[in-house]
């Protein structure tokens, strides 16, 4: 999960700094979702503060452990 969270953070950085996206929904497996959202200062919250983005994490059982979908506010994919 260390490599996975770095990969996710790099994509968030790319989307916010290069494309100017302000709202991102991450669709991930339930295990990854709980890892990203656990604790008071979770990774999700730290990334939201660091990149000034509204970040929502949604658990999706149909995805594999390392699959991540980046969606905008309307549910359209940000990265193909």
Features from the language model and the residues they span:
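DE-rich acidic low-complexity regions and acidic surface loops
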Residues: 1-80
């Amino acid at each position: 999960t260390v490599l996975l969270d770095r990969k996710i953070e790099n994509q968030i950085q790319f989307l916010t700094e290069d494309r100017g996206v302000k709202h991102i929904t991450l669709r991930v497996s339930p295990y990854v979702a709980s890892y990203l959202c656990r604790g008071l200062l979770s990774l999700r919250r730290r990334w939201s503060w660091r990149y000034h983005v509204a970040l929502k994490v949604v658990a999706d059982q149909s995805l594999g452990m390392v699959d991540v979908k980046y969606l905008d506010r309307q549910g359209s994919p940000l990265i193909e």
